[in-house]
Amino acid sequence: MHPHSSERETPHRWQAIAFYGKTRLFQLRRTVAEIGKRPLEHGKARALIDAPLMAEKRARLWRELSPEEFPLTAGKVENLRIAARAFHGLEIPPGEIMSFWRQLGRTTRRKGFLSGRELREGCIVPAIGGGLCQLSGLLYQVALAAGLEIIERHGHSRVVPGSQAEQDLDATIFWNYVDLRFRSHLPWRIEIELTTDELVVRLRGISGSRQQDPPAPSRLSPPRSLPSGDCLTCGMIECFRHPSAVKENAPALGHSAFLLDARWPEFDRWCAEHSRPGDRWFTPLDGNRWKKPNYQWTAPVGIAVRHATLAALRRSWNQRRLPAQGALRQQVLIEGEKEIARTYARMLHPQCRHVVVSQNLLPHLWRLGVLGGRSFDVLMERWPMEEMQRRLDQALAAHPQSTTLGDFRAEEELLQAEREALAAAARLITPHLALAAYFGPRAWIIPWEMPVPMPLRTSQGKPLLFFPASRLGRKGAFELADAMKSGISAELRYLGAADEGIADPFVGLYCSRGVKSDLASASALILPAWIEHQPRLALLALASGIPVIATEACGLPPHEKLYQIAAPDAVALAEMISSVLRPTLSTCVA
């Protein structure tokens, strides 16, 4: 028997019926009383996003939990995620009242709210939207700290041990008649954040807001202490609520979810090694069924795999109709990633405690708020967008004639979302050594998957230089062309049809478009890229013993056949090519 069960009377069904009828009468009375004079529903804005911080309060989301306690706590955190989306970014005009319920609306399953812990008539019971008092309590505390005028606030009638109710700093809510309302004579802004383990509430506003002393304690008599435990752990198995509570909230301790996009062999191996039975993998498509190698992730036995098939097919269809380069292509690609992320967000179970996410989906999931209250790792596939755009700007400054280096820049809100999400991530996982160096100790370096070596062929005539990319500025095409024009006696072959249009630097060079198999007869692979995220052909060349000349930005592993230059530079590149080709040229002369 639970140690507290003998201290309490067993709740009866008639009490619940009476409570239901009483609350409906109070709700009706509030609705009628406010006809024509309800507080306004406020909108989100960015006018005060840089305003001074007036107050900030934090509260723990999670505590040490038993499997029996976990489901309702996970439901509470999910309810807070939904509520945070409703309140974050609200800006309230001077003199206007902020009403908790007017802003959030009724908590229903249709809106995504789940069963959480709710204090009701001396019991902690499962209730749709349960746990939102943690948010209302923090809102009350920051309003007090910022000196806002409290219009309406109610304390709990029972005290949860260790809670803010012991200091009369709580604020209970119950649709719609038990509300929290406050206002200021100057404009102010609400910001809500769920970190891995905390709920954070901030108020921003114009300095000079009226300061108000905290109100006197609102309780006429000390609240009664609440016995510990909820419907799942209180020990009162004879209670009418107990059977349904146990049936609907099976003991659990959470699981991890892997939110994946295009397959990298390095990430596939890492995810398989770090999965456990009960975890879930989300992929765009069943790569084996659809014969799509880029989606052929290999989930271990015991892992549930789900797919965003319709979203992935729409993305694939849209990509086929896009030009090879340009702003339109990048915008459509981002929209496709956003749709995949939205689908994954709907599939995430509230009991998921940890997420592993492909980087391209990260900013969209962050903006959706589903990473709040969870720890997460990021599979780093590329430079952060902000850093990537900085590098493109640097390349454009060096080659202002380029038609591609400045064709697209992401919106600031997307950059900010990725910046915030990367800062909040637990681990940044990548095989790319340049990315790892950029993030320093936060990076978790995993080894590149080296390909099977290819059989080599001896070329006749001039040495063959292999450029494994299209003739684009970001791949170092301008630097390579200038290096070749400096007097290097070699044939150049490149991959891909995309180019710089009227600014094509390869015009006039002894070069031709090649195929992947041309690498087998190459004297060297050249990749002087400003940006290169997945240097697969360079890895194949190294594995096959072919010299590779590349920038550090390519992130390649140390190798005896790797010759690196610090950054794209035509002079340094020409010298390196000449040095690597010298033995080949000597052999040809002999």
Model-derived features: positions:
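Aromatic "clamp/platform" in nucleotide-sugar-dependent glycosyltransferases that forms part
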Residues: 530
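Donor nucleotide-sugar binding/catalytic pocket of nucleotide-sugar-dependent glycosyltransferases
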Residues: 407-456
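Short hydrophobic beta-strand element within catalytic cores of glycosyltransferases
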Residues: 547-550
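Conserved donor-binding/catalytic core segment of Leloir-type glycosyltransferases
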Residues: 454-475, 481-485
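Conserved acidic donor-binding segment of nucleotide-sugar-dependent glycosyltransferases
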Residues: 562-571, 578-584
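Membrane-proximal helix-turn-helix segments that form the acceptor-binding/catalytic region
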Residues: 339-347, 384, 397-427
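N-terminal subdomain of nucleotide-sugar transferases
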Residues: 234-311, 485
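Acceptor-binding helix/loop patch of EC 2.4 sugar-transfer enzymes
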Residues: 316-327, 378-413
